[in-house]
Amino acid sequence: MSNIVNDLVEEYIRETLAEKDGLLKELEDYAHENSVPIIHKEVSDLLKVILKIHRPKRILEIGCAIGYSSIFFASVLGGDVEIITTERNEVMIEKAKENIKRAGLEDKITILEGDAEETLKTIDGEFDMIFIDAAKGQYQLFFDLVIDRLKKMHSTLCLLYRQTIIPFFLQPRYSNKFV
């Protein structure tokens, strides 16, 4: 569980959410069994709402792991979306490629292989949405590298970080105060 909310509350929230099926469910199970960090069910439901409202056409994801988020984004948005994602772990890259191929999304999702600090410098163009889900200690660096790439659409910016508040709550002086 997350250490942010009471385990029973988190369990209740997750039980009320619809289960994924098909490949996404397989990837959730694989991630759980192999301790691969992917977005949680409640986060994916929130992201689904954001995606449907914002309707990004070009997404940058920093931190691909097994490709779950990219596949999820593409499945929610369908049609006309381009997703560029970065990953440095060779095992994860191979697994992500396999999963993206199984999803039939090779034409929509591109994996840039290598350290994000370097691969981000090679990307051209602007993005409608940037999802940062990589080394939490590098978030400021990633922000600095990508903030100018975020397209301004109707004065709306969509920059998402995953698990940005967890280190705050894991500090001993705060660990029992927000549950």
Could you tell me what each predicted segment is?
Residues 1-129, 136-157, 162-179:
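A short alpha-helical cap/connector motif
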